[in-house]
Amino acid sequence: MEFTPIDPHQHQNAATLLCCNCGTPIDGSTGLVMCYDCIKLTVDITQGIPREANISFCRNCERFLQPPGQWIRAELESRELLAICLRRLKGLTKVRLVDASFIWTEPHSRRIRIKLTVQGEAMTNTIIQQTFEVEYIVIAMQCPDCARSYTTNTWRATVQIRQKVPHKRTFLFLEQLILKHNAHVDTISISEAKDGLDFFYAQKNHAVKMIDFLNAVVPIKHKKSEELISQDTHTGASTYKFSYSVEIVPICKDDLVVLPKKLAKSMGNISQFVLCSKISNTVQFMDPTTLQTADLSPSVYWRAPFNALADVTQLVEFIVLDVDSTGISRGNRVLADITVARTSDLGVNDQVYYVRSHLGGICHAGDSVMGYFIANSNYNSDLFDGLNIDYVPDVVLVKKLYQRKSKKSRHWKLKRMAKEHKDIDASLDYNSRAQKQEMERAEKDYELFLQELEEDAELRQSVNLYKNREANVPPEEHEMDEDEDEDAPQINIDELLDELDEMTLEDGVENTPVESQQ
């Protein structure tokens, strides 16, 4: 008898059995009693995942709640909102999330629908994939920050900005910088005080963030103080209110300044008799007779502070009689010898003054200029008294004076910052002469700031200008007025931004200008 040897590598057919549900033959070695299709039809791996959920939304600040207590700003159908919705679903950790997407709903329906695709193990070694929808009901409520904003004394930190000058141009400029960089988004409220502004915050780090911003844009020094509000004797936990006192260097653009002799030598041996030409995080001075410039950091200034000798309120109008250029220039400044006469002296006397000035590039015979009349002024300053009078000019020219329309309708405008309205005090007469003078002074400062923006292209780069749709005449159709100079500076329409509805700052709140400069 012959035996046929068994080849161990010979293919053997696997045992099969019938699906208990549909009778389809399946591999019996897997240990399953149902086929894959029947498993998908009968097994629900999404069991335990709710099909409806709630999500909290603050109507005031338009933020969504991310438990336990974080409020996040998220647009509809954004990745941030999708993450918040997924975190609200219980049981999602038992399956593997493959895909998630929004299903469009009407924005006013207060419903958010999401389509989810998940994978999970249905039976032994069997992975199935299923898709389902979840609907979220948006519940409107009020977040703690907004709730505190409607009550008094809710702030935890305040930034008090002050500048001891007789005008508000610095704060007009600072206001535009804050709006451009959205540095006011964390502010609870803003109130106007004498010589400055007060910003209130719910958290200390928001105030520190504002201090860092101010350090980057204007020359300041600040001082921190704190006040104990409450203390838990059992845990030792304490609650404080923090105050940051910020003082801006009291020197503004176009101010006439006498530098201390030692400081002038340390700044490149610049002349002591200078003009302030620019304000940023440092103070820039310029010698109008040589065009030399030098920067002064706020830390150096506060070691030995000094005040300006004269400001723009003391400018006098002069008429240009002759301009003789020296051929020396630096940037857009041209050094020239200019002959001027005081406007009020015309027809009275023949007194003329010979001035070396940086305005040689824009001045011509017959133009009007503004300058400081040193020869006819009496200054109460020890620094000025220490100067050699032989080297002090009779006149220092500052800028060219352009004749403008008395009621000029500009084709551009600026955003303004909403201000917290203070309670009306019945004891104050808001129609008094003092109040009217204060309003007129504020309007004059704002008009001077607008003119400064028109004349200084470099200054315009740091602010946002918007198209004024309410202007009476489009800029292309402007006809020169008899009272306006032909070379009066104009802002090109290409420099203007379109004002979008969502960029509006006055959402149901009456806007009042907050004075702000340069």
Curated annotation (Swiss-Prot):
GO biological process: protein transport; ribosomal large subunit export from nucleus
Compositionally biased tracts (Acidic residues): 478-488
One Pfam family matching this protein: NMD3
Renumbered ranges of motif Nuclear export signal: 493-502
Location of the region described as Disordered in the Swiss-Prot/TrEMBL record: 466-491
Keyword annotations: Cytoplasm, Nucleus, Protein transport, Transport
Disulfide pattern: none
Motif (Nuclear localization signal): 399-415
Main location: cytoplasm
CC annotations in GO: cytoplasm; cytosol; nucleoplasm; nucleus
Subcellular location as annotated: Cytoplasm; Nucleus, Nucleoplasm
Gene Ontology MF annotations: large ribosomal subunit rRNA binding; protein-macromolecule adaptor activity; ribosomal large subunit binding
Extra remark beyond the main annotation: Present with 11900 molecules/cell in log phase SD medium.
Family label: Belongs to the NMD3 family.
Its biological purpose: Acts as an adapter for the XPO1/CRM1-mediated export of the 60S ribosomal subunit. Unlikely to play a significant role in nonsense-mediated mRNA decay (NMD).
Oligomeric and partner information: Associates with the 60S ribosomal subunit.
Entries under PANTHER family matching the protein: 60S RIBOSOMAL EXPORT PROTEIN NMD3, NONSENSE-MEDIATED MRNA DECAY PROTEIN 3
Protein name stated in the entry: 60S ribosomal export protein NMD3
Source species of the chain: Saccharomyces cerevisiae (strain ATCC 204508 / S288c)
